[in-house]
Amino acid sequence: MIITIGKPCAITEKGGRSNNEDSIYPLPEQVTLDQKLFMVCDGVGGAEKGEVASSLACESIQTFFSTFLKDDPTPEFIHKAVHYAEVCFDSYVQEHPEAMGMATTLTMAYIASSGIVLAHIGDSRIYHLRKGEILYQTEDHSLVNSLVKLGKITPEEALTHPQRNVIIRAIQGTHTPTEADIITLNDIQPDDFLFLCTDGVLERLKNEKIAEIFNGRL
């Protein structure tokens, strides 16, 4: 399978927050049409130095890929990349003790020869869209999603639940190791879209609106 991409687009804003805890890779001014690795990370709100956590995750995982990847990434390779990021977190916190507790989500897409490899940790999300239809979306590693799956609350109640921002997986360091959910999308067609976003976007846009945007109806 040969997958070619159109011009990637990226937007990052702090919105109503005092600082922007999101990080993206590659930066918009650095992206090229032969780019294969894409990431969006969101420093966990309330944790110390969330913006450092998201940036460090992007930087360390990109470094691991560029240094060690010889072919398409396997799940084992991605797990090792996440572990490397956790080791980098440990090193940073050792030098900056005030950053203890920093954490970040991860969404990652890699354009491979066999399809598009997706990995995610936390409540940032990845969508695969075609002609205004959401074909696939990642499942949030969040407290409210767990409650929905258990039948304790409804999806509608999850939107306003007081603990809707609590996540149950994050990159934090080797003291709290985590694991990414990984999947390969093989059904890729011309004019498909991949959308990687943080929960800040999802607080403003429901799935129906996201589908409309990527169908060019807005």
Question: Could you say what each language-model-derived stretch is?
Answer:
Residues 1-218:
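PP2C/PPM-type serine/threonine phosphatase catalytic domain
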